Amino acid sequence: MKRNYVYFLFTYLLTFVVSGCDTDIEPEVIQAANTYNEEYYQNLREYKKTDHAICFGWYAGYTSEASPSQGLHFTGLPDSLDIVSLWSGIPSNNPAYVETSYYNERYLPTAYEEMNYIRTVKGTRVVMCTICRIGSTEFPKTDAGIEAYALHLARCVLRNDLDGLDLDYEPEGDWLQNDNF
């Protein structure tokens, strides 16, 4: 009888131990993405059209498309950002574009979609960034060369349907500095 009681107790405990084991990995939301309704985004777009202090920022972290971090995605930028300057090239949806593209386009389809999302949904303007440096280009160091360089930059903005150009003036001895700027 005592032996049957031990077997019964062992079987009873084993049943709970086996049924209590859960080997399935259960996804757990640690931090859910903020979601807003269309009214919020409409108000945001309308606010950005008003006369207000502008929030401008440079952004270069969008080249790691597989990252789970929102800090590496356009969608992670603050809603209050009015203008963002592209410091890592221009995201493109065209696989023919490579990093050495004449217009500095880069094939980054996810970043391209996210960039268009913040433009259309959040009303954030996106501008191309370049440092005024004509000496390292094929443009001649003349007034005509400066004009050709300006046309090149304008074509780059227009070709990629961007909202403008961020010309960075960083004095470092290039011909397109000082009196020629």
Predicted ranges, named:
Residues D51-F181:
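Chitinase-like catalytic core of GlcNAc-active glycosidases
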